[in-house]
Amino acid sequence: MLSLLLSLTGCRRDPDLNLHRGGTKSEVQIESIQFELETYWDYEFEYGIEYDWQAEWSYGWDDEDTKLFGGELNKFESTDGFVVRGYNKGDNPNAPHQYPDLHTTISGNSFSTRFDWGIWDMLAWNNVVNPEGSPYVRIDEESTFEYITAYTNQTMHSVKYNSPYQRAFYQPEMLFSAYKRNININQSMEGFVLDSLRNVWVLKMDMKLQPVTYIYLTQIILHNNKGKISSIDGTAFISGMARTANLNTGFSGSDPVTLYYKSRMKKNIERNGELVDIIGGRVITFGICDNNPNLTRGTGVNYDDPNKHYIDMNMQFSNGNDSAFVFDVTKKVKHLFKGGVITLELDMDTISPPKKAGGSAFDAVVKDFEESEWEIEM
């Protein structure tokens, strides 16, 4: 995990005699965020079987995907610094937060500032940058000083689910946060260790940067397509995901929304000795509602999430008509509560092209997570 290091400068002599009255000049260092999906999706299912997402993922990832979805498949690195907030509660560890005494954004991994004596709460999160423009993530620091909320706004895409919201929401960028309460910065230097090489007093804090966003890779396998579905419009939606996240606690909000994300169709992909067409996508979410997956290591437990989760998209048939496909992925999302690969399979020999634009209702057979078959209404 990632540690936040608070180091206070001083001399080799008695530290009480060499600190500024009323406070001290301090250095804060935060390690950069680097992870791969193997550590991000650290599930351990029944009988000690670990989650092997690469064995399931057939869509692949090429340069066009990196450009379309805004990043590499199996690597994330935050290089845009951090946002840090600090709250001095005086000598009362239960005092409420006021306007932050420390309010800064750093471009690198460290900064120096002066801390007053007292009991501090510290919050840090990675500075979100979107190369395409303004970030979709919004940060609410004004509703309350007790915690900070991350959220996104609505797009122009209309959706069928989660009234009263009639439009889909933007997916957030990758977001991590760390929160440490009751850091005692005092003149006695209790808990500090002298770093003789650098000649500084160091207070090491067990402060973990944890994800508050979770990635789902979606793939729809089209068997026996033979050109029946010729293209897609590049949009996709997943419903029932949390609209917000609490950066202090790591818990997602209770408000379910539908997220918009991009999708792409690849043709003639070899999979288990068969040539198939695959529609792939990647969506970043705040996870399922009222949940913090970081509190326990993933064990494949279905959390008590009352919301239904659907993936839907429009597909264009070779006769020029389109149809809206809707997949119930509730069981899969609850099973993979920290994100993962969602695979859906369609046998196109069982599906007739719609006779008019806008599609028509029919049943499609889709493979379940446990490899049984069941029907969903389209």
Residue ranges, per PLM feature:
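Acidic/polar, low-complexity intrinsically disordered N-terminal segments immediately downstream
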Residues: 12-145, 336-378
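A sequence/structural signal for flexible, mid-protein segments enriched
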Residues: 169-170, 174-271
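Sec-dependent signal peptide recognition
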Residues: 1-2
